[in-house]
């Protein structure tokens, strides 16, 4: 906030306490700000402003990347504020397409690297890469937001809770997290940096479409990624369908 205001990057922080001694939140903070004539802003508002007015990522390097599916270019991006790295895998002359085939994929170490059968993430990534290679054009945006945004440590803890009978949503809540904490603002900015504005999105998650549109991208169509369930992930996939709204076409 200080930098955005054109000031030195420094400040003072203090917690505002409620009458019962707990930290004030939401409506209590709104009332406090009005009473004392203070400015107030939500973190979500700041993120929304930054995503629309300023670039949150910068491209670091681009290399050729031969893969088992075909030849791609790999673009390395870095977050301006957190230095987190993200990737974009591009194929062909995608800018000549009226609508670019795109997969925005969130990191899943266990699925993408170790081919875990507990989820469908690795299969979705492999299928999307093959689809884009066969299309001779498209983009995979690979976002470093493991475990639907809760991080690898908490994801493994959530897995342990699932072994005790909780589903993936219940496990997140038991650990104190929302079911899905992923943010697609960085992904949208990577796509914009690559010159893309109209997308044909490879996804089973309609909320992802809403998120990308919310960051100024036009979704022309959705193509499902059809993955055959197995004994290990069938309950997980059903939870994604019932509780998270995923469209699991068969």
Say what each PLM segment does:
Residues 1-250:
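Catalytic domains of riboflavin
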């Amino acid at each position: 906030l200080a930098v955005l205001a054109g000031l030195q990057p420094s400040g003072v922080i203090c917690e505002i306490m409620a009458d019962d001694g707990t930290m004030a939140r939401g409506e209590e903070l709104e009332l406090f700000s009005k009473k004392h004539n203070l400015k107030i802003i939500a973190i979500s508002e700041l993120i929304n402003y930054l995503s629309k007015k300023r670039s949150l990522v910068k491209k670091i390097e681009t290399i050729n990347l031969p893969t088992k599916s075909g030849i791609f270019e790999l673009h390395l991006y870095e977050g301006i504020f957190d230095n987190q790295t993200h990737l974009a895998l591009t194929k062909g002359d995608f800018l000549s397409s009226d609508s670019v085939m795109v997969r925005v994929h969130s990191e899943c170490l266990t699925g993408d690297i170790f081919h875990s059968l507990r989820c469908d993430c690795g299969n979705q990534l492999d299928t999307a890469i093959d689809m884009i290679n066969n299309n001779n054009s498209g983009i995979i945006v690979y976002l470093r937001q493991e475990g639907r945004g809760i991080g690898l440590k908490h994801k493994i803890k959530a897995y342990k809770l699932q072994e005790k009978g909780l589903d993936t949503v219940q496990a997140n809540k038991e650990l104190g997290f929302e079911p899905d904490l992923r943010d697609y603002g960085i992904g949208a900015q990577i796509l914009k940096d690559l010159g893309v504005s109209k997308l044909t999105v490879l996804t089973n998650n309609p909320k992802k479409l809403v998120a990308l549109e919310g960051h100024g991208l036009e979704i022309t169509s959705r193509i499902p990624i059809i993955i055959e369930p197995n004994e290990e992930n069938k309950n997980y996939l059903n939870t994604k369908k019932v509780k998270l709204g995923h469209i699991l076409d068969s």
